[in-house]
Structures are given as C-alpha cells and as structure tokens.
C-alpha cells in the first residue's frame, strides 16, 4: 500500500510539473468523451488542409497489450476503459510498474506490446494528392496498417521512417480513415532505458502528385571558407518526383531566404522532365551576399525554398533549414569552426527525459540543450542512437554542435541484450515492405544508416557522423566488422562528404601501439586512415599522445571521456575513495570509474594537446538505467 500511495503522489506531482511547464500528458480515457475527440480531430485536420506537413500527434487511442484484429478498420475501440485517448509522443513503458525481475539497464521497466489507433477524415481536395505518413521514431518493432491494409514495418527503434499511404485513404470530407500501429518491444533490447511505443512525432506530408521528394533537398556551401564576406555560392541539389501516370514538364524554382523569410538570393529556375512515376535530380547554384555565419554564439539560420511549377501553377513549396558554416578537423591543430580553433566541449546524451520517459517532448528537449549551453557545453554526442528531429532543431536554433550517432553495436547483441538491433542488422528488407527510401534486398543497417544521413544532412549543428560504439561487447565473430565499416563509410559518403566519420573505439591503447589484431582498431583505421575521418577514442585519455605519435596523419577526437562518480548535492572531504558510509560519492570531482577519469583530468588531457579536437564527457544529464 505504501508503494502504491507513493506512486500516486509522484504521479500527481509530475502532472502538476508538466502542466506548469507546458508539457502535454496523456489523458485518462474515462475523462474525455470519444465523440469530442473525433470532432476536434476532424476540425483540426480540415483547417490544416493547406499545409504541406501536418502534425499528426493529436487524437490517438492506445491499448497496452496485444489485441486480436486491432489492425482492422471496423475494429471496435470504443471501450474507454481499455482504449485511452492520448497525444503523441508517448512512452508506454514509463507508466508501468517497475519490477526487479526486469533488467537494471532498462531501469527495471517492462516492454511489451502496445496498439495505437487513429480515426480521422480528410477533405475532398486531398483526393489525388501524394500523402505520406512519417514517423520520427517508434520503439521498436513497428507494424503499420491503413484502413486495415498493412503498409509496412520498421525494426530499429530510433530511425525515422515513412510510407506513401495515398492509395489506401478515402478523401471525401466525411468517411473516416483509420491508422492502426502495433509496437512490440521485446526485452532485453537495450543497455539503457529505451522506452516503448511511438515516442517521437508523427506527421502527414501532403503534396501534389508532382513534388519535392522526401528529404530531397541537399544544401552545401562548398566555397564558404574563401567566399565569406562576399558573394557566397549555395549549391542546391533537388530531387523532384512525379507520382502520376503521365509525363510532366515542370520547373524547379529555388530561392534562399533569411530567418524572417526575406529572399536573400535571386531565384534560380531550371526545367525538368518527369516521366510517369519517375524521379529526377537537378543541381542549381545561387549566390548570397555576405551571409551571417552559423556558430555556437550566433546560430544564424537560413532556408532554401524550393517551388515546383507545372506551367504557371505552383504545385509544391518545400523549405529546408540550413546554415552558413564551415568546419575543419586537422591532425595537428584539432577542430575549427568558421576558421577559428575551438575545442569541442561535449557531453554524451541518452534520449530519456527522466520521469517523462523517452517521449520526445519539445519543451523538455529544449530545456536540456539550454541547460547545457548555460554550463559552457558546445556539443552533444547522441549516445548511442539516431537523435530525434526535435533535438536537432533545438541544436540548430540554440547553437549546439552534434556528433550524430546511428548505432551502438552492430551484428551481435551487447551485454546479453538478445533483442537489440542485432536481430535485424544483417537481415534484408522484404519486397512487400513499402518503407520509403528502402530497396527490397537491402540490409536493415544500410536502410537505417541512410535514413539517418538523408534526414540530417542539412542540419548545421551536425559536425560529425558516428556509426558505432564499443563494438567488442558480445561479438563472437568479428571477421566481417572491417567490411561493415567500409560499407557504412561508402553509404554515408554517397550522400554527404562534408563531415568526417568516426566510431567510439574503447581500445585506445591498441591504437597507440598499432595492434591491429583487434578488430576495433581495424574499424577505426578504415575511417581515420589518410586523414579522411576521425580516430574516436573512448576513455584512457593518457593514450592520446601515443596515438598521435603512431599516426601523425590521424585526426583525433575523444568520443567518450571521464565518467566521474558524483552524487548531486553531496560535498564531503572525509570520505574514502569519494564514498561516504551511505554509498554517496562526493561532488568535489575526486572519484571516477576505474576505466575513466575525473572531469578535470579529462579536460586537462583535452586542452594540453592541440591535436585533440575535443571531448564528450559521460554524461550530460542523468539517465534511467
């Protein structure tokens, strides 16, 4: 009874906190009439009919546990005692009871199966349009149905994924459509608290049949270092697609806008011939006079506006955020931003929001980034998975650099987590799975990695791609890991060559002594040789000088450092090894894990050598698990 009452009190306090901070929370099913929800939903989406990207977070129903036939359109979800109304993003693990029978790494919280359903109507002017259902992330095995038809599935808990659902929808302003989503979280699946369910944003992307492809605009400023202060070249590569059954003659009109939406370039227009159900890519070069640079102090943002015209009619308008900034990693002088040497004062970050769980609430994410900025941090490593779009948007706007990490482990489970992404890493995508951007026969790791790079390639905050972390755990046959690294390097560089690639190598002494018998060091060499990528080293900061001596052409980054053991608010000088009698550790930064360093020791190793580009301390915020 005491445990239950404590939990109830905690829930009340958290609800009050979230309401005061503007963070939305799911409403209990018994408190909201189902008809009211459906009415509001219809009104909201009719109002948004002119939007290209429609927020689709409102008006969902949720059931914890598997339910037979819940994918069917006519399934009865009216029982409010079983199907609660909620707003996404949503984590269905955080509201469950913790149990010591669950793994500590996941905060003793369960996984399980959850069903989401959404009823909605679409206006008649949507008929004939291209309609894409886009998920920014769902943990972890996600199966999507539209009006009873399965459109596909996704098996990584952190990548964005989407489906073209146009042909499955009824757009007449009165007939209800139903989207059903089954999310299965089999445990153990993670070395940290992952959460469960549709924990990131969902949106509908509604366009004309002739439109800019999803993630179809790539913006670079290849000559910025020499052109800054004058007329700067903006190179724009645009993919346009035609979902109709007839050839179309179209035009692409591209303009650079400032943060207020004012044009700062002359428009560039080019013709494009689109075959039926075809896609074409065009390149345009625009000039912007003396643009304001993006930096951590002044994160100036711009937009590339792309209009697709057929005749004189504008069929689609797409706006892509970018920033004018140039980066460099040097084997002797480290990292520079816009020509100025800067140490990356970074932290590693898991994605949970404490008592809110894994739900990617905008206000909570912006609060975290703001707090890190206040303490002097200028970079985040998204340990150890693809970040949310919300986090990257916050970093773009607030001036925080990002090491954008896609994977933790690869083809083998880590720490006994038999249900992690290794179950699908090397499996191939089936032909009936209609994931946008996927090709039947591609491996899941290729699809996930490419999805990450395609989505994030224009974010000025992203300065490093990271493809893995401490790869040795659980690996019984590393013979293919060097080839995996080569594959992933080629996948990334086919999309973006403006950022270096790294991996968090936890055998830095192997790098120092050139012991390439260890496959981790072979992976690092694939990325760092010839000065192409970054040699990423986890912990053992004392090895940095040796790595530099052994490989003077390598560019070096401390991908994970420190890991001090401090208890918040505990300040004592009388403890032994930093621990008091009640197992609290002093916050005077005198204690660290055996494989790490105190925060000040790690920082000393970072600043004493110019060739060390920076460090990412473990960890920026406390996390569950």
Feature names for model-found ranges:
Residues 1-13:
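Bacterial Sec-dependent N-terminal signal peptides
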Residues 158-167, 187, 192, 326-534, ...:
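Active-site mouth of glycoside hydrolases
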Residues 63-66, 106, 111-215, 220, ...:
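Accessory beta-strand-rich segments of carbohydrate-active enzymes
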Residues 177, 560-578, 604, 609-625:
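Aromatic/acidic polysaccharide-binding cleft in carbohydrate-active enzymes
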Residues 2, 19-35:
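Sec-dependent signal peptide cleavage junction
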């Amino acid at each position: 009874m005491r445990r239950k009452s404590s939990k109830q009190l905690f829930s009340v306090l958290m609800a009050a906190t979230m309401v005061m901070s503007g963070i939305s929370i799911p409403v209990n099913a018994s408190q909201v009439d189902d008809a009211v929800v459906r009415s509001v939903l219809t009104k909201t989406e009719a109002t948004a009919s002119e939007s290209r990207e429609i927020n689709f977070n409102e008006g969902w129903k949720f059931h914890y546990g598997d339910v037979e036939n819940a994918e069917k359109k006519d399934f009865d979800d009216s029982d409010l005692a079983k199907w609660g109304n909620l707003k996404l993003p949503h984590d269905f693990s955080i509201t469950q009871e913790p149990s010591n029978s669950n793994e500590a790494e996941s905060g003793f919280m369960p996984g399980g199966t959850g069903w989401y359903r959404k009823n909605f109507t679409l206006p008649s002017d949507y008929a004939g349009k291209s309609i894409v259902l886009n998920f920014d992330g769902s943990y972890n095995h996600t199966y999507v149905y539209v009006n009873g038809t399965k459109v596909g599935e996704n098996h990584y808990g952190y990548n964005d994924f989407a489906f073209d659902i146009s042909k499955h929808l009824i757009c007449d302003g009165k007939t209800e459509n139903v989207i059903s989503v089954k999310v299965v979280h089999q445990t153990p699946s993670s070395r940290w608290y992952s959460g469960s369910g549709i924990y990131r944003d969902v949106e509908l992307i509604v366009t004309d049949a002739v439109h800019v492809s999803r993630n179809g605009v790539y913006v670079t400023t290849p000559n910025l270092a020499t052109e800054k202060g004058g007329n700067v070249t903006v190179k724009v590569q645009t993919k346009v697609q035609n979902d109709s059954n007839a050839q179309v003659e179209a035009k692409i009109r591209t303009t650079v806008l400032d943060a207020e939406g004012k044009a700062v370039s002359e428009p560039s227009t080019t013709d494009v011939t689109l075959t039926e159900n075809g896609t074409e890519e065009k390149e345009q070069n625009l000039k912007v006079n003396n643009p304001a640079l993006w930096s951590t102090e002044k994160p100036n943002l711009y937009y590339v506006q792309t209009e697709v015209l057929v005749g004189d009619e504008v069929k689609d308008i797409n706006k892509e955020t970018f920033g004018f900034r140039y980066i460099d990693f040097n084997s002797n002088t480290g990292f520079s931003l816009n020509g100025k040497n800067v140490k990356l004062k970074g932290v590693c970050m898991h994605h949970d929001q404490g008592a809110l769980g894994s739900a990617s609430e905008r206000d909570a994410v912006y609060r975290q980034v703001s707090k890190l900025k206040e303490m002097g941090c200028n970079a985040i490593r998204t340990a150890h998975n693809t970040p949310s779009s919300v986090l990257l948007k916050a970093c773009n706007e607030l001036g925080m650099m990002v090491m954008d990490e896609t994977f933790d482990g690869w083809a083998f489970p880590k720490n006994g987590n038999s249900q992690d992404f290794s179950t699908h890493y090397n499996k191939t995508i089936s032909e009936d799975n209609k994931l946008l951007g996927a090709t039947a026969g591609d491996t899941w790791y290729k699809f996930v990695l490419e999805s990450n790079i395609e989505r994030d390639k224009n974010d000025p905050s992203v300065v490093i791609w990271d493809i893995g972390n401490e790869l040795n755990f659980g690996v019984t046959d590393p013979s293919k890991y060097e080839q995996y690294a080569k594959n992933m390097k080629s996948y990334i560089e086919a999309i973006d060559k403006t950022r270096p690639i790294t991996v968090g190598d936890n055998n830095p002494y192997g790098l120092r002594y050139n012991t390439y018998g260890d496959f981790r060091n072979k992976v690092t060499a694939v990325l760092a040789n010839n000065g192409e990528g970054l040699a990423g080293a986890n912990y053992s900061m004392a090895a940095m000088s040796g790595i530099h001596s052994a490989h003077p052409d390598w560019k070096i980054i401390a991908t994970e450092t420190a890991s001090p053991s401090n208890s918040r608010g505990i300040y004592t000088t009388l403890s032994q090894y930093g621990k008091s009698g009640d197992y609290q550790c002093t916050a005077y930064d005198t204690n660290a894990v055996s494989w790490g360093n105190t925060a000040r020791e790690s920082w000393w190793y970072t600043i004493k050598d110019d060739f060390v580009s920076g460090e990412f301390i473990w960890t920026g915020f406390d996390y569950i698990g």
